[in-house]
């Protein structure tokens, strides 16, 4: 399934978040069920991400952890499940 994510980073600069997100130990947490992905900067402290997710249960579990951590840092996540459009 394809998802779009919008992440407001609070006071964290995009570059700091990107460095944290791409660390090998953090990427390993998503291995096997997440990706490919496309990441873009949205303003000075925002992220737009498109990702293919093959295990929605793991996504739910992962996002519980992420949202708990992010709330302590003033960050906010919005997730959108993308559906095909036959127009």
In which residue ranges do the predicted regions lie?
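Short S/T/G/P-rich N-terminal loop/turn motif that feeds into the first structured element of a domain
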Residues: 1-71, 78-87
């Amino acid at each position: 399934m394809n998802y779009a994510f919008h992440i407001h980073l609070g006071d964290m600069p995009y570059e700091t978040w990107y460095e944290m997100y791409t660390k090998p130990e953090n990427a390993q947490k998503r291995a096997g069920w997440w990706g490919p992905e496309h990441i873009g900067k949205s303003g000075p402290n925002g992220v737009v991400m498109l990702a293919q997710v093959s295990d929605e249960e793991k996504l739910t579990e992962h996002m519980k952890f992420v949202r708990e951590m992010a709330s302590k840092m003033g960050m906010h996540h919005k997730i959108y499940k993308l559906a095909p459009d036959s127009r």
